[in-house]
Curated annotation (Swiss-Prot):
This is ATP-dependent protease subunit HslV. HAMAP family: HslV (MF_00248). Belongs to the peptidase T1B family. HslV subfamily. It comes from Bordetella avium (strain 197N). The gene is hslV. A double ring-shaped homohexamer of HslV is capped on each side by a ring-shaped HslU homohexamer. The assembly of the HslU/HslV complex is dependent on binding of ATP. The lineage of its organism: Bacteria, Pseudomonadati, Pseudomonadota, Betaproteobacteria, Burkholderiales.
Length: 179
């Protein structure tokens, strides 16, 4: 059976602001099943942003597990991420999940990979999913050459990814944190 897959999620941090956005397309093989999926969420009293890419059911499972760890550790992002990946590496069911998360709070942006890794990206920017490389390239160019706010960079990066990646559409959800 084919998996639901593909998306673009991008996170940009500039100054005391962070923006996380994603497109709304869900595909099954070469068929668009839904164009308005919401892959960006606010967690832990609206203090943490999370975006997911990968097999849809796996991504929801991973996000729910992360949210439980976040609650357990009173919103401490790094600790929750490390605890989740520890479980991910030791739990047989979790090890088979085909999904990735980008999570961000006021201080940190983290990528949680399908291998159970916790990565803190450089340049205040991260992108995952089938259009992630396009979005990351666009965002990096905008970060280096403009003074645009992070939410504008996320929007423009998603637009570029949507123009290039057949698994990414132009229906965007963008959330922000910070002043």
């Amino acid at each position: 059976m084919e998996q639901f897959h593909a998306t673009t999620i991008v996170c940009v941090r500039r100054g005391n602001r962070v923006a996380l956005g994603g497109d709304g397309q869900v595909t099954l093989g070469n068929i668009v099943i839904k164009g308005t999926a919401r892959k960006i969420r606010r967690l832990y009293h609206d203090k943490v942003l999370a975006g997911f890419a990968g097999a849809t059911a796996d991504a929801f499972t991973l996000q729910e597990r992360f949210e439980a760890k976040l609650e357990k550790h009173q919103g401490h992002l790094m600790r929750a991420a490390v605890e989740l990946t520890r479980d991910w590496r030791t739990d047989r069911v979790l090890r088979r999940l085909e999904a990735m998360l980008i999570v961000a709070d006021a201080e940190h942006t983290l990528v949680l990979t399908g291998n159970g890794d916790v990565l803190e990206p450089e340049h205040g920017l991260a992108a995952i999913g089938s259009g992630g490389a396009y979005a990351q390239s666009a965002a990096l160019a905008l970060l280096r050459n403009t003074e645009l706010p992070p939410e504008t960079i996320v929007k423009q990066s998603l637009e570029i990814a949507g123009d290039l990646c057949i698994y990414t559409n132009q229906n965007h959800v963008i959330e922000t944190l910070g002043g």
